[in-house]
Amino acid sequence: MSPPVYSDISRNINDLLNKDFYHATPAAFDVQTTTANGIKFSLKAKQPVKDGPLSTNVEAKLNDKQTGLGLTQGWSNTNNLQTKLEFANLTPGLKNELITSLTPGVAKSAVLNTTFTQPFFTARGAFDLCLKSPTFVGDLTMAHEGIVGGAEFGYDISAGSISRYAMALSYFAKDYSLGATLNNEQITTVDFFQNVNAFLQVGAKATMNCKLPNSNVNIEFATRYLPDASSQVKAKVSDSGIVTLAYKQLLRPGVTLGVGSSFDALKLSEPVHKLGWSLSFDA
């Protein structure tokens, strides 16, 4: 099995800390359908801020499994057009994709991604083609007997200099993982993730900016519990006093409801608390 790409080395703990929490969006709604010939359509709408306008996006996705070609086309209510062309199976382990974004008269971007995977390493490169100063971001991960190490760097092509870099090292056992990262800003993270049993997951991450004198260590702890096959409960607590709770329920096949809240345990009398919900349909 190939190692993950660099951004997925800490995917277990990052998903536990960030995924399926609904407080950040007061309201969210999405519908996904698939036709008989495999074309996927989706409609996503969310309200980024309370009493604010909706942000909406429609998308169509077509994949040809025989040739490895894929096309995804999206259009938002801000008149932003997003296109992704995927080229897989050109050679074993190689995948290329071109991602473009266009808002007429406002902004445009184009990124070419290349990923090459082999049993013991995964390499990836991203070329940003539309900036005044084109950039390249590359990463490499290697794995051996549960140990996964990786490095990432950004290169400013016009200036001919490295703009950023980061390193990560993780150990994966059957039911837990340990990891650490360090970047050029001297921001260091240490994390652990554990599958306690088939119903319970726990994890924590500590972050420190070593560049700042007397820097505090920021700690987050999260847990995920599955009461039954159709529901899940998540909770997250940070050392700053922010407590986040979320509940997700499969109402019926293809229909999922999520609700979440966030409150500051140190400022319970102040109006800083958040509440949000999400409703998803998949057919």
Swiss-Prot record:
It comes from the Eukaryota. Disulfide bonds: none annotated. InterPro entries: Porin_dom_sf, Porin_Euk, Porin_Euk/Tom40. GO terms for biological process: apoptotic process; cell redox homeostasis; DNA transport; mitochondrion organization; monoatomic ion transport; phospholipid translocation; positive regulation of protein import into nucleus. One of its GO terms (molecular function) is voltage-gated monoatomic anion channel activity. Belongs to the eukaryotic mitochondrial porin family. Homodimer. Interacts with FCJ1. Interacts with AIM5. Interacts. PANTHER family: GH26960P-RELATED, VOLTAGE-DEPENDENT ANION-SELECTIVE CHANNEL. This is Non-selective voltage-gated ion channel 1. The lineage of its organism: Eukaryota, Fungi, Dikarya, Ascomycota, Saccharomycotina.
